[in-house]
UniProtKB/Swiss-Prot annotation:
GO terms for molecular function: 4 iron, 4 sulfur cluster binding; electron transfer activity; iron ion binding; molybdenum ion binding; molybdopterin cofactor binding; nitrate reductase (cytochrome) activity. Mo-bis(molybdopterin guanine dinucleotide) binds at residues 83, 150, 175, 179, 212-219, 243-247, 262-264, 372, 376, 482, 508-509, 531, 558, 718-727, 802, 819. Residues 39-95 form the 4Fe-4S Mo/W bis-MGD-type domain. It comes from Escherichia coli O139:H28 (strain E24377A / ETEC). SUPFAM superfamilies: ADC-like (SSF50692), Formate dehydrogenase/DMSO reductase, domains 1-3 (SSF53706). The gene is napA. This is Periplasmic nitrate reductase. Its cofactor is [4Fe-4S] cluster; Mo-bis(molybdopterin guanine dinucleotide). Coiled coil: none annotated. Predicted to be exported by the Tat system. The position of the signal peptide cleavage has not been experimentally proven.
């Protein structure tokens, strides 16, 4: 039977609908299904955001040819967002990289040379020489790596081992520093453990949703569809949305609040005051499970020490705090009255009161959601702490339908960056490099000499840029990220270091991104289902997938690159004599033998793979590398509240939420009956803290690092749009997504445009103290800024909005504030 494309699509839809309804399938549809049998289907988590949707990947003749939502996936229940439906096309852009490229002139490496194809051996030869020279001349602090919340779990673990144990350098940081670091520090300060206590199942049981700086309609659309269903199917459910500009999530809001940038801190303290003044504290919960502390203030803005703002700060970078009484806390928040809050924020009083009443009502189960509006904030950690205060005052936490929930933006910002510990200060399972006991645990497990892992915190993302510019960091390897486009203050603090002849820059990527084109060596990288992988999503759900196709040309996975490069170094080339003397049996061994081909990692044979199962790395090495690395890594968390299931369980399940104890996942942490670590009779136990109590912090409003003035008279906020993901390096290569939103625009209030003689569609020069870009005026559409603020997405490589942004960071988390800087507009 031959069918036209139209008939095929129609019959396929009929077959799908009939199957869903449990009806008999028409003959023509059965014929279509028969034609489709040549397609092989397997499960995988989506490649994009931190929601962790499950998809079914269809492969045929060595290519990914189809993708659909996985109806058995509990996160998305068969639904995809627009990006998810086009997943296959991200892999087959016309400019996909397939061989290593080195800048060369006259047959040799030259910083100003043209990119020239070379072999992997030649690439590793150059890298080996650069690494060894830097290590010999300047030591481990002269090398660094910038990784990703898109790394698989074992890629992040392998990278962390290579740098922290092998090269003895903590100068490794993920791009999650730009998005989730404030959430991490907020969790650690309040609860002593990272990541949310609740899960997505809360959505169907909540009475109210409050979005703090989160446009879930575009950034987490599948979760938003579940919230929308909950809101529209129950008239008693309320949605409040807070933002510095109006966006698509406001369409569902019962209370849509637009506030002055940075003044969310004021609103949070006002609500705490309202709860106290209206006797809405859950006294039983509060008295048993909460401590009060006053945090250090005037902590600076994470700029260079020579910056006037840093010189003026009384307590730069301080996370110190001291105990305080309830009466002192009550007096502290009492300053944040309704009148003062309305004046400072620009929010009408009635809207503020409506918002506060949601938290104060003992019969309302409330979920607080936030993403970059809170985290990309010079007081992002404080914002996280302050929203926890509201839930701790009212006891609305760790129970179905209520709790604070930090949403993530990358597929494994939680599972890899945070849980594995690829930050410059972290080790697996919430351990840190500054703690001698934690270092000792890792060194013993890894069978390396004591004192191998440095106690000094390495360079975080922004500090890496500065060190490159200053000539202190000389060899720099970035993987699975496009920081030349995504990071702040490109002109002043990033590009100078990358193009400095003292420095050698390596970029591993599937495509010639802005970062790749600014590098010295480009390594072609396998992506998504071209390798076996694992991600951890925002609700602590760890999900696995199998390799389903092979990468094009000579492209190799990040894991392969890390492990194979480690063969180039022997212990005596990277470790001092005093370390080798502690374990002389490691002399003469390569880092590959010491870190990866160990008895513990290599004990899982390749025969555990199905005969026809692709796994390029393991089949080349002769052992099941991914399983060995995962089981070694999982050991750190088991028995300590971070329990992961056995490796094989994840290939069978649609993800499991840790802690997984006795085969059972955990939906709600810290509460009796839900969390296996909370004993009968304890009620609640925040066991990340020694006394089992969470902390409420007293923290004030402090202004932004840069605000509009007479010359630079507008706030600039940056972010994403539905159709594109981050810098667009994948989504802009999907024709349908590119057509839907082909270039960045400057969203602006019509009156602000009119005052500058600008009309919709005009070209406009956007200028800050650091740089300028040309964009296009948009006075309508999905984003409607108030007067005084403009919004611009960062997906467009032709409009590098981060030439404009300031590299101010939260001094505690070191996360950049991409939401607030000052600009002016000039008509072109």
């Amino acid at each position: 039977m031959k069918l036209s494309r139209r008939s095929f699509m129609k019959a396929n839809a009929v077959a799908a609908a009939a199957a869903a309804a449990g009806l008999s399938v028409p003959g023509v549809a059965r014929a279509v299904v028969g034609q489709q049998e040549a397609i092989k289907w397997d499960k995988a988590p989506c490649r994009f955001c931190g929601t962790g949707c499950g998809v079914l990947v269809g492969t045929q003749q060595g290519r990914v040819v189809a993708c659909q939502g996985d109806p058995d996936a509990p996160v998305n229940r068969g639904l995809n967002c627009i990006k998810g439906y086009f997943l296959p096309k991200i892999m087959y852009g016309k400019d996909r990289l397939t061989q290593p490229l080195l800048r060369m002139k006259n047959g040799k490496y030259d910083k100003e040379g043209e990119f020239t194809p070379i072999t992997w051996d030649q690439a590793f030869d150059v890298m080996e020489e650069k690494f060894k020279t830097a290590l010999k001349e300047k030591g481990p602090e002269s090398i660094g790596m910038f990784g990703s919340g898109q790394w698989t779990i074992w890629e992040g673990y392998a990278a962390s081992k290579l740098f922290k144990a092998g090269f003895r350098s903590n100068n490794i940081d993920p791009n999650a520093r730009h998005c989730m670091a404030s959430a991490v520090v907020g969790f650690m300060r309040t609860f002593g453990m990272d990541e949310p206590m609740g899960c997505y199942d809360d959505i169907e049981q909540a009475d109210a949703f409050v979005l703090w700086g989160a446009n879930m309609a575009e950034m987490h659309p599948i979760l938003w569809s579940r919230i929308t269903n909950r809101r529209l199917s129950n008239q008693n459910v309320t949605v409040a949305v807070l933002s510095t500009y109006q966006h698509r999530s406001f369409e569902l809001a019962d209370n849509g609040i637009i506030f002055t940038p940075q003044s969310d801190l004021v609103i949070l303290n006002y609500i705490a005051n309202y709860i106290i003044q209206n006797n809405a504290i859950n006294q039983d919960f509060f008295s048993k499970h909460v401590n009060l502390r006053k945090g250090a203030t005037d902590i600076g803005y994470g700029l260079r020490p020579t910056h006037p703002l840093e010189k003026a700060a009384k307590n730069p970078g301080s996370d110190a705090s001291e105990p305080m009484s309830f009466e002192d806390y009550k007096a502290f928040v009492a300053e944040y009255t309704l009148e003062k809050t309305a004046e400072m924020t620009g929010v009408p009083k009635d809207q503020l009161e409506q918002l506060a009443q949601l938290y104060a009502d003992p019969n309302k189960k409330v979920i607080s959601y936030w993403t970059m509006g809170f985290n990309q904030h010079t007081r992002g950690v404080w914002a996280n702490n302050l929203v926890y205060n509201l839930h701790l005052l009212t006891g609305k936490i760790s129970q179905p339908g209520c709790g604070p929930f930090s949403l993530t933006g990358q597929p494994s910002a939680c599972g890899t960056a945070r849980e594995v510990g690829t930050f410059a200060h972290r080790l697996p399972a919430d351990m840190v490099v500054t703690n001698e006991k934690h270092r000792d645990i890792c060194e013993k497990k890894w069978n390396i000499p004591s004192d191998t892992i440095p106690a000094k915190i390495g360079l975080h993302a922004v500090a890496q840029d500065r060190a490159l510019k200053d000539g202190k960091l000389n060899v720099y390897w970035t993987m699975c990220t496009n920081n030349m486009q995504a990071g702040p203050n490109i002109n002043e603090e990033r590009m100078p270091g990358w193009r400095d002849p003292r420095n050698f820059i390596i970029v591993s990527d599937p495509y010639p991104t802005v970062s790749a084109l600014a590098a010295d060596l480009i390594l072609p990288t396998a992506m998504w289902v071209e390798k076996e992988g694992a991600y951890g999503n925002a609700e602590r759900r760890t999900q696995f997938w199998r390799q389903q196709v092979q990468a094009p040309g000579e492209a190799k996975s990040d894991l392969w690159q890390l492990v194979q490069f480690s063969r180039r170094f022997k212990t005596e080339e990277v470790w001092p004599e005093e370390l080798l003397a502690k374990k002389p049996e490691l002399r003469g061994k390569t880092l590959y033998e010491v870190l990866y081909a160990t008895p513990e990692v290599s004990k899982y044979p390749v025969s555990e793979l199905a005969e026809d199962q692709l796994n390029d790395e393991s089949r080349e090495l002769g052992f099941y590398l991914q399983k060995g690395l995962f089981e070694e890594y999982a050991w750190f968390g088991r028995g300590h509240g971070h329990d992961l299931a056995p490796f094989d369980d994840y290939h069978k399940a649609r993800g499991l939420r840790w802690p997984v104890v006795n085969g059972k996942e955990t939906q709600w942490r810290y509460s009796e009956g839900n969390d296996p670590y909370v004993k009968a009779g304890e009620g609640y136990k925040f066991y990340g803290k020694p006394d089992g109590k969470a902390v409420i912090f007293a923290l004030p409003f402090e202004p932004a690092a840069e605000a509009p003035d007479e010359e630079y008279d507008l706030w600039l906020s940056t972010g994403r749009v539905l159709e594109h993901w981050h810098t667009g390096s994948m989504t802009r290569r999907v024709p349908e997504l590119h057509r839907a939103f082909p270039e960045a625009v400057l969203f602006i209030h019509p009156l602000d445009a009119k005052a500058r003689d600008l009309r919709r569609g005009d070209k406009v020069k956007v200028v800050s103290r650091r740089g300028e870009v040309i964009s296009i005026v948009e006075t309508r559409g999905r984003n409607r800024p108030p007067q005084g603020l403009v919004y611009m997405p960062f997906f467009d490589a032709a409009q590098l909005v981060n030439k404009l942004t300031l590299d101010a960071t939260d001094p505690l988390s070191k996360e950049t504030d991409f939401k607030k800087c000052a600009v002016k507009l000039e008509k072109v």
